[in-house]
Amino acid sequence: MAQIWEYIKIALMNIKSNKGRSVLTMLGIIIGIASVIMVIAIGNGVRGQVNDELEGLAGGQIAFYVDSTRKETTVTFDQTDFDAIEANIAHVKGVTPQLSAWGTAEGPKGNFDISMTGGDPGLQYTSSEPIVKGRYFSQDDCDAGGNVCVITESSAVSLFGTTDVIGLTFEATFWGVTQEMRVIGVRKDTASSLISMAGGGTEIITAECPLSFMGNKLYYDIDDFSEFYVIADNSAYCTQVAQDALNLLEARHGVRGENQIMMQSLSLIHISEPTRRT
């Protein structure tokens, strides 16, 4: 015990005689511990932020597709599959395939490249950005195959110089086919598009339209698809919706257990806390 006290006295004497070095040592220890705490806190915050962003971008989305690399694959999807899922699976907000087309658009403010995405009304829910003016296209619009579209705020400004564009028209040309498009809705810009514009990126018109328009007016094949999306009411239902929809599809196509139909629940892509070794 006496020896321990002797060690303590020597330590205290060394601290007193080397105050500067002792303070720096203590400061280094404090900074080191604080840095570890900060890194852990930032890691947790970034992980949470990334997960929130993923939830916002793909919350509730489930992709169904076929493995096209397999020679024995016989499955394709059509409108009857989409209707069956909406009619028979609970907690489904929307079902839609997607077709994309690149072309040119001409409005009062000039000519631009345009990226057009066609789908069913459920296409609205594949993006988290809200409709800020007008409305999204409805099933009636799809049944009519009308020349209607929803564009982004930046696209509206590029084409017309304003976001007050509901009812206005512009010309869009795809593969030599020109159609007059009527704007019925405006969607809020994505963060990535705003960053691109701020950085001087090329202005591209972004539009969404009924799939039937692309088939009837642009002559795209809209009868069969190799992939489509199901959007659940909430990401909490994704697992159940995905399994129920897969069971339904396999039964409809007679391929149960053959792994011809694949799925990926985009809401289940999360950054987890690293596993610690014990």
Predicted regions and their residues:
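N-terminal Sec/SRP start-transfer signal
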Residues: 1-31
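Membrane-interface segments of envelope glycosyltransferases acting on lipid-linked substrates or membrane lipids
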Residues: 4-5, 85, 205, 214
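Hydrophobic, regular-secondary-structure patches
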Residues: 43-115, 122-125, 215-218, 236-240, ...
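Single conserved hydrophobic/aromatic residue that forms the stacking wall/gate
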Residues: 269-278
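"Rare, low-scoring activations can occur
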Residues: 187-190, 200-265
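Short, strongly hydrophobic transmembrane alpha-helices
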Residues: 20-48
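Hydrophobic secondary-structure segments that place a key small or acidic residue at a functional site
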Residues: 98-99, 109-217
